[in-house]
């Protein structure tokens, strides 16, 4: 069944913001949007001419109709015109969270001022928001002006952004996304911030030069809501929302005499529309004065790989390395997780020797020091290793670097390093590693491949067996990595033949 997302917000007669923008954005991400209208605005591209709040009785009737038949996975809230509306919505949300079998995620975009500068509330609602609504909100998505209105913190630099986010959290909000469209720092760039589960995420991209920005805030929060309803983690929803808005700004047009609306396109398919993940040591990180940890060693642009990796066997012993190479598996990875194994260095050296003997590509998982020492073809690292591995040493040694990614945020983070290949997973649940909350599935893989395939060889990994391998290969991914499909097969040799046939490897 299609995911249902509600928008509790105002109507924009000009069609650029409010529930009109919400529904377009939700549709672009394949979810069904429902609405409860809080206000009817008379507006066009030049501004808001009047604001007409809907009575609480009519709002409640809309909510009761929806909840009786079409409960939401996520509820996005936009313009609330007065204190009575805030109190009513808070009462309903409290009941949903207490009684629904699957309590909804609440995304709140605190719309107070239109792009044109016109006020969008009948009265000062800040105190009522802090008292009644914010303690129920899972994700709040204010812009610069709305952040300052709610917190009293003026966003004059990164530390002020962090301070404002913590102030919002103190009101009971669970996670914060602060939109940087009005914060021109560094000049010519749009910097956005997210705080979620004790971690911060910064995104940046060059500002899109267009005056047609009406509805960007509504649309971004609606994309985040749609993605959350489909199981994306917030950091990925944040990324996709930004990419969608960037694409929409590039395609935006004028329909009247004033500011045009952001365009609504589709799932963002061009890497040029995606923001950069800002990290310590990067140019934007330096501009924002991010502290660089002592152990952090940034490097980018690793040795390339010719062609695709094909069937990729990930195994934990030298014997399995030899069996795979003997049976014409051209890419293998030695994954020994026991760093205290007394034969660790011996096994790594032998695996590299076998790779040279059979003409195969042998990647060493994690143990980059020994991989350098013994001249491995390459190293495979996880995201957590990027903070501690000596990436310059790996690059200077000429080793190829493969990186694991689990979703779109990690994909873009890995892209900063320009590795030799990118692995995306886990595609399916797997018993070889705890991937709770990180199962990607075929739908996400189908989006990942066209984004990255022109940049790097791509690898799909996680829970892939013979029965699943052909549908994984059909996404266009360049390599299919397997573990148990070979090591637990009755005949590993025949399993290799069958797998290569299934993925179309000659």
Language-model features: where?
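Short glycine/threonine-rich catalytic loop with a Thr-x-Gly-x-Asp
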Residues: 13-16, 205-224, 461, 488
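Hydrophobic faces of well-ordered beta-strands that scaffold small-molecule active sites
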Residues: 33, 106-108, 140, 307-315, ...
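Glycine-rich phosphate-binding active-site loops on the catalytic face of alpha/beta enzymes
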Residues: 36-42, 255, 335-336, 383-391, ...
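Charged C-terminal helix
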Residues: 50-53, 69, 236-305, 501, ...
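Conserved phosphate/ATP/ADP-binding segment of small-molecule kinases
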Residues: 121-200, 350-420
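Catalytic cores of alpha/beta
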Residues: 362-377, 406-418, 449-454, 458-459, ...
């Amino acid at each position: 069944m299609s995911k249902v997302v509600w928008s509790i917000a105002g109507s924009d007669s000009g069609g650029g913001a409010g529930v009109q923008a919400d529904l377009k954005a939700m549709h672009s991400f394949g979810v069904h949007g429902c609405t409860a209208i809080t206000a009817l605005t008379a507006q066009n591209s030049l501004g808001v001419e009047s604001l007409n709040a809907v009575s609480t009785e009519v709002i409640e009737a809309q909510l009761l109709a929806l909840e009786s038949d079409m409960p939401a996975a996520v509820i996005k809230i936009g313009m609330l015109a007065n204190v009575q509306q805030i109190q009513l919505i808070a009462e309903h949300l409290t009941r949903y969270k207490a009684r629904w079998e699957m309590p909804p995620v609440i995304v709140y975009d605190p719309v107070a001022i239109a792009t044109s500068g016109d006020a969008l509330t009948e009265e000062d609602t800040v105190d009522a928001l802090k008292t009644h609504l914010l303690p129920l909100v899972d994700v709040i998505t204010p812009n610069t002006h709305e952040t300052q209105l709610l917190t009293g913190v003026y966003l004059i630099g990164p530390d002020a952004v962090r301070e404002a986010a913590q102030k919002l959290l103190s009101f009971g909000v669970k996670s914060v996304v602060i939109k940087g469209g009005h914060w021109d720092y560094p000049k010519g760039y749009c910097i956005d911030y997210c705080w979620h589960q004790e971690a911060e995420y910064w995104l940046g991209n060059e500002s899109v030069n267009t005056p047609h920005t009406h509805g960007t805030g509504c649309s971004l929060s609606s994309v985040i809501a749609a993605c959350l309803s489909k199981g994306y983690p917030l950091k990925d929803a944040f990324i996709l929302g930004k990419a969608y808005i960037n694409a929409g700004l590039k395609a935006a047009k004028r329909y009247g005499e004033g500011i045009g609306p952001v365009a609504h396109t589709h799932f963002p398919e061009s890497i040029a529309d995606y923001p950069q993940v800002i990290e310590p040591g990067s140019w934007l990180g330096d501009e924002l004065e991010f502290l660089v940890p002592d152990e952090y060693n940034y490097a980018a642009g690793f040795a390339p790989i010719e062609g695709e990796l094909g069937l990729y066997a990930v195994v934990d012993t030298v014997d399995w390395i030899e069996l795979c190479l003997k049976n014409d598996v051209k890419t293998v990875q030695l994954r020994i997780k026991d760093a205290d194994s007394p034969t660790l260095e011996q096994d790594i050296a032998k695996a590299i020797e076998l790779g040279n003997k059979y003409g195969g590509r042998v990647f060493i998982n994690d143990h980059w020091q020994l991989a350098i020492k013994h001249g491995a073809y390459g190293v495979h690292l996880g995201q957590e290793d990027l903070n501690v591995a000596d990436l310059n040493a790996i690059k200077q040694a000429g080793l190829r670097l493969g990186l694991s990614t689990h979703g779109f945020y990690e994909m873009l983070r890995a892209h900063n390093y320009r590795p030799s290949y990118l692995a995306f997973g886990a595609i399916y649940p797997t018993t070889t590693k705890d991937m709770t909350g990180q199962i990607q599935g075929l739908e996400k893989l189908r989006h990942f491949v066209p984004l990255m395939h022109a940049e790097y060889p791509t690898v799909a990994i996680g829970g892939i067996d013979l029965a699943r391998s052909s549908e994984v290969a059909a996404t266009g991914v360049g390599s299919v990595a397997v573990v148990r499909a070979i090591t637990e097969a009755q005949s590993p040799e025949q399993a290799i033949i069958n797998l290569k046939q299934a993925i179309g490897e000659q």
